[in-house]
């Protein structure tokens, strides 16, 4: 299985970033250009739940929506999804993403937000999901600006 990852430093505690990521109402307002809506369509965010992400106009030429099944949750730290429907599922099978929020050492008011994907291209010519990584990191960077407004 291939892997790709990236990370950004956020100027907020990991717990706050975690709460923002897990709350559909908040996450849908952080950066509508990249993510216009998130809904748990089955479950409440625990393993086995299904979450639908509707992507915004900034990435809709690449991915319009993604249906994800939550596989693992480490409360306050990370969530791992397997993409089970949408555009990414057609390009990669499997496609598994982990978002994690880890406090920085020596400063509890900052955290490292990491995006990691494990994937197999569905066709030999399918490129790595660099656009997905770049969009995810831009979205995570938006957390800092959003937290100032709510």
Protein language model features and the residues they cover:
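Residue-level preference for beta-strand/loop junctions
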Residues: 2, 47, 62, 93, ...
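Structural signal for hydrophobic/aromatic residues that build the beta-strand cores
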Residues: 17, 51, 70, 81, ...
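Beta-strand/loop substructures that line and gate deep hydrophobic ligand-binding cavities in soluble
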Residues: 80-138
């Amino acid at each position: 299985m291939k892997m790709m990852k990236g990370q950004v430093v956020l100027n907020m505690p990991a717990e706050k970033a975690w709460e923002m990521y897990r709350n559909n109402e908040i996450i849908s307002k952080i950066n509508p250009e990249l993510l216009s809506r998130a809904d748990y369509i089955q479950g409440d965010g625990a393993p086995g739940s299904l979450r639908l992400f509707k992507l915004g106009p900034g990435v809709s030429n690449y991915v319009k929506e993604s249906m994800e099944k939550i596989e693992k949750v480490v409360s306050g730290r990370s969530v791992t999804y397997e993409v089970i429907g949408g555009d990414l599922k057609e390009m990669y099978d499997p496609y598994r993403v982990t978002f994690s929020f880890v406090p920085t050492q020596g400063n509890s008011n900052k955290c490292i937000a990491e995006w990691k994907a494990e994937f197999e291209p569905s066709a030999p010519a399918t490129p790595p999901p660099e656009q997905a990584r770049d969009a995810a990191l831009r979205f995570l960077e938006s957390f800092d600006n959003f937290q100032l407004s709510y």
